[in-house]
């Protein structure tokens, strides 16, 4: 970038005086002071302990920890949407620093993940080279913006010194279990001791077994089943076009990959999973203690989705079919059951005459993703299994069907259908001529509004009645809820009867699913896990961390036919044979172990980065306890502690923000941090919006190359449509800060941003 001199500079319409404020003069002034700030360490915040300590500078000063959601270092660099929040936090931090506060404000880079890997595959350049180059460019852009950051604290999630501690935290979670009585995580060794001493008894399928009668391997499997991180065969989103498994959040509403737009299929695979559901109540209840926007709290509440009701058991020839319902008072109106096509009892339930139809339907359902299956606008389909189950309150034998709108991953994978009180069940019953029994009498006004008589058969009603009316047809010889009573009263009566007669029990369920934590790709944190000859997982010792990511030249995953759901993933690390096998002494002598070949998801590094800013050079701990308490400890009794101000986008409401809270709560339970929550105050800065343009295929085209003439828009001579929305690389409509610096200067850009 050029600089001004004392002689007039040529410009539009003639000469420009040397000290007229323009972009060149702005650059000279701004860079002078940016250099001054660096040379004088103007924005460095002292710690209370460790290499960044300065107790004299800390004494008598109130602390303030300000945090921006750190950027992903893409090849395009920053666009003008990124600084919207950065500038606001910078102004706030500068003001508070001027009032005497000790302000910690820094920024790092969320640099692992699929986008970098996909870019590397396209360009043939190793993702590490790309990532480091992109980070250098972003550092330049941020410095030029004049942000008051403590550069000593900047981190990148791909640094070995950083992901060493990501792996260490993973092992803390892996080596923990959730004690339901104490409502907290505890070390897995404590569970082992409780079983060994007899203090804790076995339950479930081992309820009548003595712990000491089990082999060491059997005991180990039971212990592993309690871990907060565990291996499980579970329905996953398999994307053969990317060669990897995706989290639900990485699949679009159309059932395709968010990156690449490939088809996604539901498959059962063995995957690492984090038991975030153990923390569902705390994640939900502690929202009330946070200074967050109500809209974000509501999104998390809905995502966690706590429901109270009952688990009810229906007897069948294949065994008991358990359902969860929020309305056990409607059991008297249950006239059929619907199971997920993947339900484990389907094979045993299906009659010989219906087997071919059931298998054909299941094959079709396998080709659909969860979003497609639960689309309210899609016609509901199903197949009769030919079996029946017994309604526990009526004693009636009711048909058992399968339907793709019932998901195995939610609830029990089975529902009790009450067509008179549920629109979906009503439509299904109408379509397949299944019985409908009214259990609540609507008001006269309801009948009048639908122009039908109160005496009309409910099967002829135009729709289900979903309101509250007078209970009818709801009694047996032991229980009756007929008449006018509240729903809560009726639920209590039915729940009591179910428990007394061993047909069910009151229960709470959640929409929140456990977190799928494996990725079949290269550019991510390796798992600090090895497997023995029995295929049992073991922790890599702390002193051997980090498990370094091998430098591969061929880092492409085995991408497959995007439409072939029968294929299996082959992670790139599985090809590194000299890395795959390792000899370790884990306490019983040197043995050969096999490394885990999956890597962690991109969310891993961002689950704890706020903690590393506090103590970025500490090689002994992920953060010094005194330093964490100073910057993030609770301010008073009942205060959660955490970052004082966190600024970022609303798009992270149920992903990064929820995952970070989960990790932080585990660290709190284990005594590694003093704060119960990572982010006490949250602010969403909104978006910078811009026009985007799409061609006839619906693909975005570069906005800067679109030509406007007489109100019409073309790209390379072809007509395109214009839409208005968020600025982003994928929409090809970004404007970079560099363009603003060159034309107006950074300070002018900051003012108008």
Language model: regions and residue ranges:
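Conserved oxyanion/phosphate-binding beta-strand-loop segments in alpha/beta enzyme cores
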Residues: 2-6, 14-67, 97-106, 130-136, ...
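N-terminal cofactor/phosphate-binding cores enriched in small/glycine residues
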Residues: 33, 42-46, 64-130, 136-143
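Short, solvent-exposed turn/loop segments enriched in Gly/Ser/Thr/Pro and often Arg
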Residues: 50, 69-70, 104-115, 154-162, ...
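Catalytic alpha/beta core of large soluble enzyme barrels
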Residues: 89-90, 102, 343-442, 459, ...
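Switch/connector loops and helix/strand junctions flanking conserved nucleotide-binding motifs
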Residues: 113-118, 446-449, 691
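Nucleotide/phosphate-binding sheet-loop regions of phosphoryl- and nucleotidyl-transfer enzymes
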Residues: 264-266, 273-276, 332-360, 471
